[in-house]
Swiss-Prot record:
This is Holliday junction resolvase RecU. The gene is recU. It comes from Streptococcus gordonii (strain Challis / ATCC 35105 / BCRC 15272 / CH1 / DL1 / V288). The record marks K99 as: Transition state stabilizer. Keywords: Cytoplasm, DNA damage, DNA recombination, DNA repair, Endonuclease, Hydrolase, Magnesium, Metal-binding, Nuclease. GO terms for cellular component: cytoplasm. The keyword DNA damage applies. GO terms for molecular function: endonuclease activity; magnesium ion binding; nucleic acid binding. Mg(2+) binds at T82, D84, E97, Q116. The keyword Nuclease applies.
Length: 200
């Protein structure tokens, strides 16, 4: 080691540059939070009871580094999840999936799986209201697409390509984002799927 005047070493003069890491796994968390906040708003005003479904997980191994702490080190999905949210609105069962993309012209169909499409079909067959919320983060636009149009496109596309934005705009509804509720999707359901009036 080279000694410098006043016993400074060379390492004292080197600035450490911290590399920023991007967590791609949490890319959709902002949109999810917007939906959760919207659902909390609806619940607090007695408009609807809609919650995010828990993901079914089987815990296999747990470590206990301290008595008061437990750390899950191995877990598996018990079964394929269906859709993200479900609940009740004005006596109607509501069931929907939420997807986000940075693409500007289409929504990747690889985001949808056969078991989800089948589940949506089953909900519709029972008279439930089923749809997808599609958020284009680059455009700052969110659409509500009724499940029949997603199912129809999925059957043609076989889940392989992407759903064009113009298809979504033709068959879906643009949701005007708000401060609270952030994603007022119940207004779309009320006006266009139930033929009623807005909640606001």
């Amino acid at each position: 080691m080279v000694n410098y005047p006043h016993k400074l070493t060379s390492k004292n003069n080197i600035k450490k540059v911290k590399k920023e890491t991007v967590d791609f796994a949490n890319r959709g968390m902002t949109f999810e939070k917007m939906i959760n906040d919207t659902n909390d708003y609806y619940l607090s005003r007695g408009l609807a009871v809609i919650h995010k479904k828990p993901t079914p997980v089987q815990i296999v191994k747990v470590d206990y580094p301290k008595r008061s702490r437990a750390k899950i080190v191995e877990a598996y999905f018990r079964q394929a999840s269906t859709t993200d949210y479900s609940g009740v609105y004005r006596g109607h069962y509501i069931d929907f999936e939420a997807k986000e993309t940075r693409q500007k012209q289409s929504m990747p169909m690889k985001n949808f799986h056969a078991h989800q499409i089948e589940h949506m079909n089953q909900v519709l067959n029972q008279g439930g209201i089923c749809f997808v919320l599609l958020h284009f983060s680059s455009l700052k636009e969110t659409y509500l697409l009724p499940a029949p149009y997603l199912i129809e496109f999925y059957k043609i596309d076989k889940g392989g390509k992407s759903m064009p934005l113009d298809y979504i705009q033709k068959h879906g509804y643009l949701i005007e984002q708000n401060i609270l509720p952030s994603v007022p999707y119940l207004d779309i359901i009320s006006k266009n799927l139930l033929g009623g009036h807005s909640n606001e």
